[in-house]
Amino acid sequence: MEILCHSAPLHEIKAEASLIFVINKEFSHEWIADSELFGSVGFEGKEGQTLFIPQSKTLYYALDSLTPDSIRESSAKALRALKKYPFSSFKVGIYTQESLECLEAMAAGFLLGDYNFETYKSQKSESKLTQILISLQTHLGRQIDSKSFETILARQSAIARAVNLARELVNTPPEDATPQKIAQAAQKVAQEHQLECRIEDEKFLEKEQMGAFLAVSRASIHRPRLIHLTHQSPKPKLKVALVGKGLTYDSGGLSLKPADFMVTMKADKGGGCAVIAILQAAKELGLELELHGIVGATENMIGGNAYKPDDVLRAKNGKTIEIRNTDAEGRLVLADCLVYAQELKPDYIIDLATLTGACVVGLGEYTSGVLGHSQELKHRFIECATQSGELTADLPFNRHLKKLIESKVADVCNVSSTRYGGSITAGLFLSEFIEESYKEKWLHLDIAGPAYVEKEWDVNPHGASGAGVRMVLQFLEQLTKES
């Protein structure tokens, strides 16, 4: 989708169709030419209501407030609606107050709303829409500088490409997204964007004594891979390590999932795919930092050599783990990868994982959990997530929940002794593999809810959303500004 800006007023721009947002039922605005028809067709200007007028080839989209979140979502949904018509282009004006936040949100909405996963469809949906023409004259008559627009568009385009890469990788079925193939996808990103890339196999994992990671992979015919991407700016202001859970398929292992719960488990690689995508965007955006992306890619399957409940595993840092449930496998892979990441001596560590169903139960499908020991760091991250348009909530650690992962036979147990607080106890488990010097510099993001939703929502299509990409990039940008 091509987005172009024009300095001319909206009515002077030539396009095959028009998109007009109706803000807070302001039917008298000069851009609204068909208001006399609204009453006869039942258009009241309620939030989310749409009306297409064939005579003027105009889609009206109503929203109650002019906030970035509202503009972003409305732009995505309006784009999807217009793609159903036989138009190759449409024009739209800018809706913004003094700041350019809403312009950013509009660009993001169009770019993120344009994605659709149809790789395996014999009949692809047909849309002629290829061009969006945006007037730089706002709905309040203010003129936006074209350079400001181009800067915003370039940034949002890089972010959208990354989000859509993550979506595509997560949506890809497990047979076509094995650990080896995800590693190949990472190599392709590295080659196209001049990133450093290391792909390590079982021999490396054995050498590094990553016993937890290796145990999870044992029963799969698709061998594990540790993916390590690096973006190195010429004068980095800081060093950050991202760690992603890359379970390309999770059957639950011997603690087998029920059939209904096994469907969509291709999405258990959501954290790892987000990490790969973030590295791509970091390079495109020219972020002034040294950024490491580490993905533990494997399957969790059943078989004669599968790891078992009652096993005791030894992680890379020497800690022993009692296994009581093989379906709590992602944290085992992350444990070894987090230890590996700390050896790089970064300033901050952030892990992303579709880690717990408990997080979805507690927060719903659309919100990610943010966990860590530093209240200040969590607060800063949540602010950045809000600016990016992603929903997050603080899930606080406490000493009582920590007792629930104690083991009588090992240093720690891989699951809690009760069914409650599962997303927090999972985070506390990961904390066991974070050195004391990094406790205040580490964040755990549980993206299990929004990573894959089987319906359209916000700017997202059915399926993978690319959860984590936007908010982590926003946070990395903020860190570089502060450094």
Swiss-Prot record:
Gene3D superfamilies: Leucine Aminopeptidase, subunit E, domain 1, Zn peptidases. The keyword Hydrolase applies. Its EC number is 3.4.11.1, 3.4.11.10. The active site is at K257, R331. It is an enzyme of class 3 (hydrolase). Its cofactor is Mn(2+). This is Probable cytosol aminopeptidase. It comes from Wolinella succinogenes (strain ATCC 29543 / DSM 1740 / CCUG 13145 / JCM 31913 / LMG 7466 / NCTC 11488 / FDC 602W) (Vibrio succinogenes). The gene is pepA.
